[in-house]
A protein has these predicted regions:
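Bacterial N-terminal signal peptides
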Residues: 6-17
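Sec-exported extracytoplasmic/periplasmic mature domains
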Residues: 35, 55-59, 87, 106-109, ...
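Short alpha-beta junction capping motif
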Residues: 81-125
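An acidic, glycine-rich "communication" segment
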Residues: 26-29, 34, 38, 43-46, ...
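N-terminal secretory signal peptides that target proteins for export/translocation
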Residues: 1-3
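Short C-terminal domain-edge/linker segments immediately following a structured domain
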Residues: 60-66, 112-117, 143-146
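Aromatic-Pro/Gly-enriched surface loop or interdomain linker
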Residues: 21-81, 85-89
Length: 165
């Protein structure tokens, strides 16, 4: 005997059709963290290129508009992913900004940091390491091991490519 539930769900799905999101915030936006000193936007087209690759390789729709956000902005928590770039030394964020970023990351937010100088030991690299140390003083910054799931979640990645190999 077929239950009413088993009949109702397929009929509902057929009537409704494919689920689509209609809100403006349904497309993935990646805001770039804006900071006071240093060059917080050395490559203005970088986010658009990243979002283009996300659209090309996944079913995620993106909003490629340029968006910069300060850590003090109340909408920070609306974005699951934020981007920080630079090539120069910058001053570590204020105590309240560090607290907001720490909370953002602790609650599941993702921060991608792009060292546009491409040099380990550059002024930007040193500033980032100081910032991470201030954010999470008990957790050392370590290289991701080759057996980490990030290297096999969507693609099998045999080697890291790009500027840093």
């Amino acid at each position: 005997m077929v239950s009413l539930f088993k009949l109702t769900i397929p009929l509902l799905l057929f009537k409704i059709g494919i689920a689509t999101a209609y809100a403006d915030y349904s497309n993935l936006s990646i805001p770039q963290i804006k900071y006071k000193d240093g060059d917080s936007n050395p490559h203005p087209t970088a986010i658009g290129s990243l979002l283009g690759q996300i659209e090309r390789r996944t079913s995620i729709e993106t909003d490629r508009g340029s968006l910069q956000i300060e850590l003090s902005h109340p909408n920070l928590y609306q974005y699951p992913f934020v981007y920080m770039a630079g090539s120069e030394e910058f001053e570590i964020f204020s105590g309240s900004e560090l607290e907001r970023l720490r909370n953002y990351l602790s609650y599941g937010g993702f921060l991608l940091i792009d060292n546009n100088s491409s040099n380990i030991g550059s002024k930007f690299d040193i500033s980032v390491r100081k910032m991470i140390g201030a954010l999470f003083p008990q957790i050392p910054l370590n290289k991701i091991s080759r057996d980490h799931s990030i290297f096999r979640s969507f693609y099998l990645i045999d080697r890291v490519s790009g500027r840093m190999q």
